[in-house]
């Protein structure tokens, strides 16, 4: 079973990584191609394109200028440990042991606007480039056009490497839209986490993001390979709802938030 999650806007390059092991992104040449385009933008153009404050636009202009394809532990950090945000709070990889990282490296992928697809231990230099950004490039008007079929083909390679055909989608719609489902050589299982609000079960973004990260952690810690085991997920008060679910979409409900 292969999982995909979204990246995060918040990054942490101050905390020392809990493992020294690292790999290099497989698709750095494509990231370098995008970086050439990003370096053409002024801070003002970045602010307008990405709806950022002047301060954040300046920060990211500096990141683009400093970016180099020669990744080392001195100028980059493992992606799973560099990303911080609701999904990664739920995933909580800071307490992973080496066996956990081994399983995650084989069974988890992070979708990225700049890097396309990242493995957990892939070194990553800081950036800001959401998949939905309408950055015109040589392949089209946005990043969906830039990545085209490639992300789907790379996920197929990862599925083939582990001898499986199940892709567990724990990513947001923005990011999974970069995956062309008809090209996948496997079965996609979507997930939904709903909280009780005003007498109805609804998706609450903050909680849903944390739950997606928590499920990724659950799969890694339990070494799950069979999707049937996902139905036993009951962390943070969620429970599987057979009446709300289908074989292709697993729905989990919760009556009240839990710490």
Curated annotation (Swiss-Prot):
GO terms for biological process: response to hydroperoxide. This is UPF0246 protein Avin_11220. Belongs to the UPF0246 family. GO terms for cellular component: cytosol. It comes from the Bacteria.
């Amino acid at each position: 079973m292969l999982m995909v999650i979204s990246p995060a806007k918040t990054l942490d390059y101050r905390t020392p990584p809990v493992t020294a092991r690292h790999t290099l992104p497989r698709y750095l040449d494509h990231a370098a191609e995008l970086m050439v385009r990003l370096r053409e933008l002024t801070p003002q153009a970045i602010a307008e394109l990405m709806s950022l404050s002047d301060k954040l636009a300046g920060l990211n202009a500096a990141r683009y200028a400093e970016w180099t394809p020669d990744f080392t532990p001195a100028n980059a950090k493992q992606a799973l440990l560099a990303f911080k945000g609701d999904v990664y709070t739920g995933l909580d990889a800071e307490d992973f042991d080496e066996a956990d990282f081994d399983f995650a490296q084989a069974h988890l992928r992070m979708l990225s606007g700049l890097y396309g697809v990242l493995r957990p231990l892939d070194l990553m230099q800081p950036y800001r480039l959401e998949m939905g950004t309408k950055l015109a490039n040589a392949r089209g008007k946005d990043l969906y056009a830039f990545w085209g079929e490639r992300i789907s083909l790379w996920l197929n390679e990862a599925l083939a490497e582990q001898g499986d055909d199940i892709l567990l989608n724990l990513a947001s719609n923005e990011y999974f839209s970069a995956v062309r489902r008809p090209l996948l050589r496997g079965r996609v299982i979507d997930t939904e986490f709903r909280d009780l609000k005003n007498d109805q079960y609804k998706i609450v973004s903050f909680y849903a993001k944390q739950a997606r990260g928590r499920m990724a952690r659950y799969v890694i810690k339990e070494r799950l390979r069979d999707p049937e085991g996902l139905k036993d997920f009951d962390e943070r008060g969620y429970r599987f709802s057979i009446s709300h679910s289908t074989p292709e979409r697993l729905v989990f409900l919760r009556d009240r938030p839990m710490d």
